[in-house]
Curated annotation (Swiss-Prot):
Region called STING domain, residue ranges: 160-314
Protein family: In the C-terminal section; belongs to the bacterial STING family.
CDD domains per UniProt: STING_bact-like
Protein name from the UniProt record: CD-NTase-associated protein 12
GO MF annotations, alphabetized: NAD+ nucleosidase activity; NADP+ nucleosidase activity; nucleotide binding
Catalytic activity: NAD(+) + H2O = ADP-D-ribose + nicotinamide + H(+)
Activity regulation summary: NAD(+) hydrolase activity is strongly stimulated by c-di-GMP, weakly by 3'3'-cGAMP, very weakly by c-di-AMP but not at all by 2'3'-cGAMP. Self-association of TIR domains is required for NADase activity.
Domain annotation TIR: ranges: 5-129
Taxonomic path: Bacteria, Pseudomonadati, Bacteroidota, Flavobacteriia, Flavobacteriales
Enzyme class: hydrolase
Length: 314
């Protein structure tokens, strides 16, 4: 599994804090941290000739976690008194990342003297004292610890996670339940294959036509069809199998993956180039999320020993 990616946003005036936070987050970890202003070709968040909002929307699909740094940038009049608050764009970015990544995967690293609006309360807040390095470092470490706890437990609401859950509930779970309840795979003729495995084949990359992609993979494998009763429903499940010496391997190609391409294309701005490196990177990331979510749900239900997820070359 690739390293988790973290986005750090701040005002231009407080880039030094973002850089300090990056060093702490990356020290002895597998996190890949990108600050909003980094302009290396493979890490740039805001690019020339691109709109600010489009770049932000793209960024929310690239990262696993978001940290926004709130410092004493602007004075505002609040109910007749003067207050200090972060830049409006920092608050906007915080809301955008929370909306995409969820509350547990975002944090607001904020100066303790800043007034926090009631709408912001309830998210992960890490307070620090201005010009106090220890205070700032401890606040960043608390965020890192919070993100560490998410690494092995999060199943989020990205398109891939939703599709993996649907695929699991409609195929993997009833198939595994049938195998367990019947002591194996019971075909419509009454024969039981006692040793069963579900082999889920995942393409290396997603194309615009996933169905044709799977047909090409399927053509390389000699299988036969088998039908068995769908647990709890008045219909059968038809599967492709490889049977040998009383053992059976169910071969499945999750064509539901085509929904990732469709969902991502609708989440991104209309003028986003679907042939770009960025788009391919987002698709690849969603493919990883699909596999990750599928494994986590199977492990949760105790079916992980019945499934094997492989890429198309295995």
């Amino acid at each position: 599994m690739r390293g988790k990616r973290i986005f750090i946003g701040s005002s231009s005036e407080e880039l030094r804090l973002a850089e300090q936070a990056k060093k702490i987050l990356e020290k002895n970890t597998n996190y890949q941290v990108t600050i909003w202003n980094e302009n290396m070709w493979d890490k740039a968040v805001f690019r020339l000739n691109n709109s600010y909002l489009n770049d932000l929307i793209r960024a929310t699909l690239h990262f696993d976690f978001g940290i926004l740094i709130g410092t004493k940038d602007d004075k505002v009049i609040f109910r007749g008194s003067e207050e200090i608050q972060p830049r409006d764009n920092v608050l906007f970015e915080l809301g955008l990342f929370i909306g995409r990544l969820g509350l547990n995967n975002c944090a607001f690293l904020v100066d303790e003297e800043i007034k926090i609006l009631s709408d912001v309360k309830g998210i992960s807040l890490a307070r620090f004292k201005e010009k106090d390095s220890d205070s700032f470092n401890n606040a960043v470490l608390s965020i890192r610890e919070s993100f560490d706890r998410q690494n092995d437990s999060d199943i989020n609401f990205f398109p891939s996670s939703t599709l993996a859950a649907v695929y699991y509930e409609n195929f993997i779970k009833p198939t595994c339940s049938h195998i367990i309840n019947n002591g194996g795979l019971l075909d419509k003729n009454g024969y039981i294959y006692k040793k069963c495995t579900i082999k889920i084949i995942i393409p290396k990359k997603l194309t615009s036509d996933v169905n044709s992609q799977f047909q090409r993979i399927k053509a390389k494998i000699e299988t036969k069809e088998l039908s068995f009763e769908y647990l709890g429903r008045p219909r059968n499940i038809n599967v492709e199998i490889i049977a040998e010496d009383g053992e059976v391997m169910i071969i499945d190609f999750p064509t539901i993956l085509s929904g990732i391409n469709y969902a991502i294309s609708n989440l991104l701005p209309q003028d986003f180039n679907s042939m770009s490196v960025d788009y391919e990177a987002i698709l690849s990331r969603e493919l990883e999320r699909f596999v990750y979510t599928l494994k986590k749900i199977a492990l949760r239900d105790g079916f992980d020993d019945l499934i094997k997820i492989v890429d198309e070359d295995n």
